[in-house]
């Protein structure tokens, strides 16, 4: 047996996504290596096994690999130094540090991952033969740490890591399968980050290059993962057909390789495309599969999103108690997660307000409201035939019941909308501010306006209009694609340009500089008063936003008079 050749074969199998085959081959080599008493080859086996276990989420296997590598390296480090021992200690110390960084990231210990990554960053005098491997390990470790941050919705904290990844890739000159694999992993990871944060134009070339490089090497799993991220981008761009095509191509490969998290994401997007064509029952079946897979993995943030997404089926079916129960389960998951943020709670409250709004519209005779006693197929037909009009009569018991429910919807949606929008003008970059408005605050504010209008609350409508007029946010520019609120419940872009901690917006949030010529003010506005003898507008809802989410919707300054 030519052990070095077999080690190369094992690495090729791992790159191709056949971790089981690679693991079995590596384990079969151990008796031969022990007979030859080659510690350097045994260390390579342990390092490769650790990477396989890391990729498959077998954390105990990663820990054992790290322990055995460190034990062997410690023995050589205590011997008199020579070229062989120096090379061995330097190389496999780094391989162990890489595994430590990846393991800490995988279990959500982001501080530990940062510490391990800093150790791997050691740029002291390097051995020429190890320089390119060291660069590759740094790139790969940063990608793993950044992906783990994004999985915990900590996209803002991942930005410095992604910036270093992009910079290092520009300087990375190595060739061969190892180098190609590093570029593919980084391309898919960074492309997904760009999709998650709404930078679709930047994501596309990264994902296409990663897919092309994976295809050239025959790595079908990497190709499928790139296709899945491209599908997510297509959905964000409102291209339902493109999403369906890419997910359908990616899913069989991802399922064959048993990548549970990506399988769940495939089912999520398949369900979205089904709902986009009005197939409620098919969408619910897809999301049921996604929920099951995320429960198996124990991913609370993903699970909370799929529960919110599944609640739309109950909303369309007019089974509002079921929808409220799903949202309550999602709230419990946020409560149990150390990574939850005020923004997630605000969006959840806004969605709960949507349930109250839908319940109210059913009382008001909305022609597309479902019947909880009918089948989903009958609800699908009702949705297809509906004209979006109300048949109820003013003054009836049903009418007043609906008005009460709309009031409750406003109690949820308006404070959430004000809290979310309070972030927008703390963002100094105009493009980033526009992304936040289009993908985060805009849809939530639209829901608040809709409830105020349907509630026939002219005072609230006028105050919301005044709030927007003071911000100068009405325009006649290009409109975002027309799509239902359901389309982004589980796939909304995640902002990275602002801090989501429950504190007032800090970026340029003080008083305006005197004498400035700009008509646009960053940070919260002072309270707005529409009439001399009235309280500042939206006072009740601003107080709720502060109580629930810790957001200061207005600045601590004298009120502006808007009637002058």
What are these regions (language model features)?
Residues 261, 269-275, 279-281, 287-564:
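Alpha-helical solenoid repeat scaffolds used for protein-protein interaction
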